């Protein structure tokens, strides 16, 4: 594999790069609200923070249990519904949630998605209330890599696909790009791979990579699926 492919895969395997600028923020916020992390992780504090997600968990349980009987255009719910409808009757068994501190600031996040990898929605708490960090669906998906990092795969068209590593900010309110690759057509109509560290799909803001399209499509980073609790059988709040 050529030089850039080796470099990019090293990022995925070692996760050693520091976070870059905030040019790709799914939440669209330039200055997230100030949060107060837990000082002491005792059982009572943790329980209170987790309880803040109880209504959301039950909402997602309802969507997953009867996806064809529900409809929603609410950010955070559309990707969950899409995945649940694709799974049909298996959705309550194959989808779940996890309340865990993924950013490392002492405040737990809520992740919802498939047990086998894709995260459809991620929330954190701001001023004690759930706030959507990002949403994933079939053509714009996120898989957990570990250490607060997610691998992104998306597609805008047959010729435009993107892959990259994004990390949660320390306060957990948004994602920051570490490395991003995407394909586009050059003036001759050939598929070319471009790279940047902002998450931009704009060729003018990117550099041409020496990675071939075949190498791009062959990228297969090892994810670390979150240990989600299936909605079926989980204790209702």
Predicted regions and their residues:
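C-terminal motif of bacterial Sec signal peptides marking the signal peptidase cleavage site
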Residues: 16-19
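Beta-propeller blade termini
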Residues: 93-102, 141-149
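Acidic/hydrophobic-patterned starts of short beta strands in beta-sheet-rich repeat architectures
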Residues: 103-113, 148-152
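Beta-propeller blade repeat segments, especially FG-GAP/WD-type strand-to-loop junctions
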Residues: 120-133, 168
């Amino acid at each position: 594999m050529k030089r850039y492919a080796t470099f990019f895969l090293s990022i995925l395997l070692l996760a050693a790069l520091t976070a870059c600028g905030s040019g790709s923020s799914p939440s669209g916020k330039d200055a997230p609200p100030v949060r107060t992390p837990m000082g002491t992780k005792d059982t009572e504090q943790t329980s209170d923070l987790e309880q803040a997600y109880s209504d959301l968990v039950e909402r997602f349980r309802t969507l997953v249990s009867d996806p064809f009987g529900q409809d929603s255009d609410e950010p955070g719910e559309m990707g969950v519904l899409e995945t649940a409808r694709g799974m049909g009757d298996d959705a309550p068994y194959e989808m779940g949630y996890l309340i865990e501190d993924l950013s490392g600031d002492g405040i737990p996040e809520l992740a919802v998605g498939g047990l086998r990898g894709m995260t459809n929605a991620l929330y954190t708490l701001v001023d004690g209330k759930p706030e959507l960090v990002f949403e994933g669906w079939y053509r714009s998906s996120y898989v957990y890599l570990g250490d607060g990092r997610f691998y992104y795969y998306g597609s805008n068209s047959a010729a435009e696909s993107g892959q990259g590593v994004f990390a949660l900010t320390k306060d957990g309110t948004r994602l920051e790009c570490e490395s991003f690759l995407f394909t586009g057509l050059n003036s001759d109509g050939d598929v070319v791979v471009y790279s940047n560290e902002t998450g931009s799909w704009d060729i003018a803001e990117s550099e041409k990579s020496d990675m071939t399209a075949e190498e791009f499509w062959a990228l297969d980073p090892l994810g670390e699926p979150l240990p989600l609790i299936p909605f079926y059988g989980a204790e209702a709040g």
